[in-house]
Design a protein with these regions (language model features):
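Beta-propeller folds
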Residues: 1-263
Length: 263
């Protein structure tokens, strides 16, 4: 990232090599420069720079997103279904980038608590793909002291909105541990609820469609294994759903008292 900001930091031999190859490429494509410009404009003209997604319902709110030609990161918006209050921009990507003052700005997840009062969001401000999780009280618009570094970026709220789950990255950039963080407590007290022992596997956590269970999914490129535990459990003890079998991928969900498995 440093050499992208300042090419003079490159080793002179490497810099000369890159410049020489760039010159070869430029000369080779000299005859089609106008075609390149025309293709770029044609592709750009097919992209709707000012666009709004369809609204979807979640509990008391409608949620949707909006992109604008003048911005790069878009806005996330919500409004009470009964229309009693005006639209609320709860995450403005371009404004957040400006406020953080970072040249690089990568958004991981933006997740609203089930009580609708809190927003947990993850950002990569260095281009390292290590995401830091921040917590904001949407009633005040102010961030809480809860800051969690070196995560995969994923965030899953507990149903009582008092805590959320996240996965930490190991030294090889793999998410192999899932933690539970309780709002207002020290990060040092976060509880490890699952650890994948196989270094070739990664893990993540999500909520089933009926919100009855949390599912911990582990996988490599060709094999998966899922665990589950009740979403209202006081003590978390993940239960293996089906033992992993090489070259077999499956996922599970629950609805109206049944588990559904897709293999």
């Amino acid at each position: 990232l440093e050499v992208l900001k300042d090419a003079n930091k490159l080793d002179p031999e490497v810099k000369n090599f890159i410049n020489a190859n760039n010159k070869i490429t430029e000369d080779y494509f000299q005859d089609v420069k106008n075609l390149q410009k025309n293709l770029f404009q044609e592709i750009k003209s097919k992209i709707k720079l000012n666009d709004t997604t369809l609204k979807f319902k979640d509990k008391k709110y409608y949620y949707w997103a909006k992109t604008e030609a003048k911005g790069n990161y878009g806005k996330r918006i919500r409004q009470l279904i009964d229309g009693s209050k005006p639209e609320e921009i709860y995450f403005d990507g371009d404004l957040e980038k400006k406020n953080y003052g970072s040249e690089y700005f990568g958004v991981g997840s933006v997740s609203i608590s089930h009580c609708d009062n809190f927003m947990a969001y993850s950002l990569d401000l260095k281009g390292s793909e290590y995401y830091t999780i921040y917590l904001r009280d949407l009633r005040t618009g102010k961030n809480e002291k809860d800051i969690i570094k070196n995560t995969s970026g994923g965030i899953t709220w507990s149903l009582d909105s008092k805590s959320f789950f996240y996965s930490k990255l190991d030294k090889f950039h793999r998410p192999r541990q899932i933690f539970k963080h309780t709002i207002g407590t020290s990060i040092k007290d976060d509880k490890l609820i699952f650890e994948e022992k196989d270094e070739t596997f990664t893990c993540g956590i999500g909520l089933t469609s009926d919100e009855k269970f949390f599912i911990i999914s582990t996988s490599d490129h060709i094999t998966t294994e899922d665990y589950f535990f009740p979403s209202d459990a006081n003590e978390i003890k993940p239960v293996l759903f089906k033992q992993r079998k090489k070259d077999v991928r499956y996922s599970i969900d629950s609805w109206k008292g049944y588990f559904y498995i897709h293999t």
